[in-house]
């Protein structure tokens, strides 16, 4: 019964997180530059993992965010005040039976998480954002129905090349460094270094093919990049203000103090979990009445991939 459940949120190492996460998700467990916090969420009565959360520095390009703020934000302010949810993945069947994705999201939107990040990184987080998994190819998301804690603010711009997986990026980056006199293409202290390095790699490849007169290869390479960009669907972007009413003005530097909304205390972790419990109880009761409760744990194995009906 969800009303009897209790949860603990703990940060864990990359090694432990990745080893567990790959059992329940098809997502690559890549790092992103900047902040990285990996939470394991455990149900303490049963000592079982309910889900995984990885938070990190926000992406640079976001049309919905820019529209909401009224401009392209200063990167220093963006990194100081925004945090992004990269993994919000419930273990199954907890996610299906109890709306586990909503629980994990409420934890992300809680003051517990905000204060944790503030203490760890010496920042003043006042905004959380994440994007839907399936993009505009699917009309619903685990983040729907979470107002006022989380709101849809629009569709991300699809004209954007994703960064390479860590393994391939590391190998290619080493190749370029070796041929650049041991020097990195982008300075080590640069922001969004991985994205900038990848962009530089692409520019060098194009220039090299052009200078060697390899017109056909250049055309093929350009077509490949265009295709990679085209594979991206627009995704719904979601935003939480942690119960502050003047986040936009604060991030834009128009005020130096955050103002609490009347519902500010609702974002405390205990209250956030209680909000979820009511939703989860209704979900569980409906599934139970229909005989649709799931009992089997879903993990990724070579012999059961066809039996798992969703991609996380």
What are the residue ranges of the model-derived segments?
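Long, compositionally biased intrinsically disordered regions
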Residues: 40, 174-312
């Amino acid at each position: 019964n969800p009303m009897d459940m209790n949860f603990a949120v703990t940060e864990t190492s990359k090694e432990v997180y990745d080893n567990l996460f790959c059992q329940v998700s098809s997502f690559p467990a890549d790092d992103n530059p900047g902040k990285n916090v990996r939470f394991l969420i455990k149900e303490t009565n049963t000592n079982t993992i309910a889900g995984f959360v990885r938070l990190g520095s926000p992406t640079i390009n976001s049309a919905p965010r820019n529209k909401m703020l009224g401009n392209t934000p200063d990167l220093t302010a963006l990194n100081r005040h925004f945090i992004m949810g990269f993994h919000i993945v419930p273990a199954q069947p907890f996610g299906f039976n109890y709306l586990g994705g909503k629980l994990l999201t409420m934890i992300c939107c809680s003051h517990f998480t905000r204060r944790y990040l503030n203490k760890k990184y010496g920042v003043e987080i006042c905004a959380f954002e994440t994007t839907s998994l399936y993009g505009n190819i699917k009309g619903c998301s685990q983040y729907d129905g979470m107002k006022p804690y989380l709101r849809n603010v629009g569709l991300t711009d699809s004209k954007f090349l994703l960064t390479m997986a860590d393994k391939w990026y590391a190998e290619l980056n080493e190749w370029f460094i070796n041929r650049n006199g041991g020097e990195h293409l982008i300075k080590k202290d640069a922001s969004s270094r991985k994205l900038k390095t990848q962009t530089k790699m692409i520019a060098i490849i194009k220039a090299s093919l052009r200078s060697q007169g390899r017109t056909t290869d250049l055309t093929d390479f350009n077509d490949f990049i265009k295709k990679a960009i085209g594979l991206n669907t627009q995704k719904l972007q979601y935003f939480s203000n942690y119960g502050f009413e003047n986040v936009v003005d604060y991030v834009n530097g128009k005020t130096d103090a955050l103002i609490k909304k009347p519902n500010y205390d609702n974002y405390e972790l205990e209250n956030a979990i209680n909000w979820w419990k009511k939703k989860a109880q209704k979900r569980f009761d409906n599934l139970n009445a229909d005989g649709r409760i799931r009992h089997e744990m879903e993990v990724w194995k070579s012999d059961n991939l066809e039996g798992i009906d969703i991609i996380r």
